[in-house]
Each structure stands twice: as C-alpha cells, then as structure tokens.
From Swiss-Prot:
Function in brief: Component of an amino-acid transport system.
Gene Ontology BP, a term: amino acid transport
Pfam families noted in UniProt: Peripla_BP_6 (PF13458)
Domain of life where this protein originates: Bacteria
Disulfide bond residue pairs: none
Signal peptide start and end residues: 1-23
Family named by the database record: Belongs to the leucine-binding protein family.
InterPro entries: Leu-bd (IPR028081), Leu_Ile_Val-bd (IPR000709), Peripla_BP_I (IPR028082)
Keyword annotations: Amino-acid transport, Signal, Transport
Name under which the protein is recorded: Leu/Ile/Val-binding protein homolog 3
Length: 368
C-alpha cells in the first residue's frame, strides 16, 4: 500500500478518534488506589463512579457523557505528581482528588500551573487552600475546624483528665494534632505528653511506656487508621484504659480491624452524617444498589463530581477550567448529596460542619 496514503488514512482515523473522545467530558480521579491509605482511595473511587453513573443516566453534563480517568498516587507525593502529570498530558481539565494533604499540596501546584481544576473530597490540611490557588476546592472542612470540635468536647467533658497528643509526622496528622493541642491549651488544658510515631512502624512500646508513665487518660492521635489502630491495641495491651480520640483518619473499618475490641469507644470527628440529609436520598439509593456503604468519603467524592457538574453548567463551558472556577467562586449555592454548598474565595466551604462519632462494637455511631 502507498505509504503516503496509509499515513493519510491513519491521520484521519486519529482525528476521528480525537473527535469522539472530545464529545465526552473526562474527569480525572487521583487517589491512593494502592498503599497504606488505599481503603480511603477506594471510597473516593466508588463515590465518583456512582455519581457519574447517575449523572449519565440523567443525560450527562450539557448533554455530554462523563467518563472517569483514574490515576493512582499510592499516598506518596512523588507518585502523586507523576499521576498529575499523566492527567495533564491527557488534556483533562477537571480532577476529583486528592485524599491526603501531603500529596494534595504538591499535586495542586502541578494542576494549577496547567489549568486543571481540582475538588478534593478529603484533604483537610489548611496549607492546601491557604496559598490562594484559584483552581482548588473542597467538599470537606479543614483540620483546624474539626480539631476545635473535638477540643471543645474535651474541654466540656474531660477537663479533669490527663490528655496526651500524638501525631504521625504527616501534613494531615501533625496539622490535626497541633490544632487540637492549641485549642485545648487555649481552654486551659496542658497536655501531659506530646510525641509522634513514624508511619509504617509496628512497635509503639517505647511511646506506650511514656504515655503510661505520664498517666495519660485520653490520647488524641493525628493520623490514619493503620498506626491509630496499632496504638489503640498496644495501649490496652499495656493495661491502659486510655480513651483514643482522632479525626476522620480513624473512620475506616480497617481501624477496627486492626485495633479490635481495644478500639471500642474511640471517638473521632468527621463530616456530619450526610445520610440524614434528604438531599442524599438519590445518592444513597444508587450506592445501595451497588452494595456500597454511604460512608463520609464516598459521599464527599460523590458531591465533588456534582460540584464540577454545577461549575461546568454555570460557566457554559466543558473545557475552560478557569471559567468553571470563577463560576464556583460566585457565592451561589450548589445542591449536592451532602447538602447545599457555597465556597469562600479560598475554595473552602463557607459553612463546613463536623460531628463526633464513636466506634461501638465494630460500628460507627453518632455521639449522643
């Protein structure tokens, strides 16, 4: 066959494929699909997938089908940047993600530089939005806000208890722990011990000895379920009856699986239970049909897709991320599965809300 003709045919085929692909609105999902926090990444993946299925069944966005492109950050900043570059290289303009603040901050820089809008369902670190990037939004609150909720509870109910504060050295965990520490200090409680653990470590006996010596009755842990579950177990194995507190990093079922009955009574902050909001009805039904629990991160990811949809519809553009960001900053309410959202100029929720939850016999219940 004539090579020139073959090249022409191949080029035409490429153009045809590109046109077909362009007819879809592609949303990238950057999340830890592998690694130590993959359980949270799975929640985000399922929430985004379900939202897209519901949206497409209703006609898509501006009549165009929505498709998802997944990129695994493994909970590691370097891999997150690599995943972001992959998304940028594919010409994608919208992203749901990231899960952890430590990955979200460097990735947001890459996305901002390349005109990609991101909505994170779970990255709560203040540094993410404090830099004033126009393209960054959340469907969750900030660390300081949830830490203050738990601190307020401690100040009202445990002011006579000896409180220790521990973190995992990460942006999320340390930020959460430091915000909690500052809040209880302001309220008149001085921690009896402040320390850290290293992610991946299994033996916390030296730390437990220090906590026991300090007489800690309450241990606030800023970090995720793996280290939190081990710490809870080892505290109780050492004969301590200390109550463990934390943030949404302790909300995954793997926390209970690791800590076992030693995790009984653990208190943690998380977004208000969206399942009690009438606006969540359709999302809950769609998730239930797929046997997916309506967990907080799942619902936040579902809402993140809805936020992108609302921005595209307001901006009237499926590929101008700057126009979409401007539309989301307009202060008008956005109806989502987790309720009505509005955004501040930093991309934070104007009225975030947190509740305190408790691990009770392997189940999460609201604190009465």
């Amino acid at each position: 066959m004539n090579l020139k003709l073959l090249s022409s045919v191949a080029f035409a085929a490429t153009i045809g494929f590109a046109s077909a692909a362009y007819a879809d609105i592609t949303i990238g999902v950057i999340a830890p699909l592998t690694g130590p926090v993959a359980a949270f990444g799975d929640q985000v993946k399922k929430g985004a997938e379900t939202a897209v299925e519901v949206i497409n069944k209703a006609g898509g966005i501006k009549g165009e089908k929505v498709v998802l492109k997944f990129a695994d950050d493994a909970g590691e900043p370097k891999q997150g940047v690599s995943a972001a570059n992959q998304i940028v290289g594919d010409g994608i303009k919208f992203v749901v993600g990231l899960v952890t603040t430590g990955v979200a901050v460097p990735v947001s820089d890459v996305l901002s530089e390349n005109g990609v809008l991101m909505v994170t369902p779970t990255a709560t670190g203040p540094d993410l939005t404090a830099r004033g990037l126009e393209n960054v939004f959340r469907t969750c609150g900030r660390d300081g806000q949830q830490a203050e909720v738990m601190a307020d509870y401690v100040l009202k109910n445990m002011k006579d208890k000896k409180v220790a504060v521990i973190h995992d050295k990460g942006a999320y965990g340390k930020g959460l722990a430091d915000a909690f520490k500052a809040a209880i200090n302001k309220g008149g409680i001085t921690e009896v011990h402040y320390d850290s653990v290293t992610p991946g470590d299994k033996d916390f006996s030296a730390l437990v000895t220090k906590l026991k010596s300090a007489g800690a009755e309450v241990v606030y842990f800023g970090g995720y379920h793996a280290e939190g579950g081990l710490l809870s177990r080892q505290l109780h194995d050492a004969g301590m009856q200390a109550l463990v507190l934390g943030g949404e990093g302790l909300s995954n079922t793997e926390y209970w699986a690791i800590g076992g009955t030693n995790a009984q009574g653990t208190l943690f902050t998380n977004a208000k239970d969206a399942t009690k909001n009438p606006a969540a009805k359709d999302a809950i039904q769609a998730l239930k049909a797929k046997n997916i629990p309506a967990e907080a991160f799942t619902m936040n990811a579902y809402a993140a897709v809805e936020v992108i949809k609302a921005g595209i519809e307001r901006a009237g553009s499926t590929d101008d991320s700057a126009a979409v960001a401007k539309a989301l900053h307009d202060g008008k309410p956005i109806e989502t599965a987790i309720g009505t959202l509005t955004y501040s100029e930093t991309g934070d929720l104007s009225s975030p809300s947190f509740d305190i939850f408790k691990w009770d016999d392997g189940k999460i219940v609201g604190l009465e």
